[in-house]
Amino acid sequence: MFKKILSARGMGQVLSVFAALIVMIIVFALINPLFFSATNITNLLRQVAPILIIGVGQSFVLITAGIDLSIGSVAGMSCMISATLMTKFNMNPILTVLITIVCCLAIGLVNGLLISVAKLPAFIATLGTMIIARGVAQIVNGNMNTNGIYSDAFKNFFYYGRFLGIYTPIWIAIVLFAFFAFILSKTALGRHVYALGSNYEAARLSGVNVAAAQTKVYVISSFLAGVVGLILTAQ
């Protein structure tokens, strides 16, 4: 993957994206002088934090040459479960978070087992769990709008709070990015992930537990989607 990025064509594509981004930043700065204000920058970072978190999970999946179509529905399911538990059942926020994350991990585990053990194509397996997660979300909240998250601690921890002047979603994204970047670059699981993406059969023959590695990848993806759902709930 990195060889493709570092190739002349790959570098050209990367540089063109950065050039377009720089042009957009310059244009917005000229249109509105407050674009580079600290308030605007922190608000932008807070809004893109969920995308970064989702991107971390998808990086694991894509490196293994897989695909996870269920992440959007898992995030939505996380929203509905957490919101319903706190509004309809007045559940403690900590217990709510634990139950929500466990439900999301279950979806990731099912994805991993369907792909690594049942040998279903990742597209088909995650399409099925996408539909399941979406159905669970609708069943949990009765297909009705859920309003009134009254737990200030929950809202501050996942969205509105600040630490050192920076919104908590940004800190959550930074911590998760650093943690999973470490896993990907410094642990056996990270090496196995790259091995799977490079050559699945060679990885298996070299002694890598490919089923376990694949399952962990999809569990990580669903876990991070669940965290994003909690952030969106707090928002």
Question: What do the PLM-derived regions correspond to, one by one?
Answer:
Residues 20-36, 137-141, 181-188:
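Structural signal for alpha-helical transmembrane segments and their membrane-water exit/capping regions
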Residues 24-89, 113-119:
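Single transmembrane alpha-helix segments in multi-pass membrane proteins
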Residues 8-9, 123-187, 213-216, 235:
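Transmembrane helix-bundle core of multi-pass membrane transporters
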Residues 14-19, 44, 52, 73-77, ...:
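Hydrophobic alpha-helical transmembrane segments
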Residues 69, 89-95, 122-123, 189:
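Membrane-helix interface segments
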Residues 23-26, 81, 132, 178, ...:
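Hydrophobic residues within the alpha-helical transmembrane core of Major Facilitator Superfamily
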Residues 92-97, 106-111, 115, 162-235:
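Helix-loop-helix "hairpin" substructures at the membrane interface of multi-pass membrane proteins
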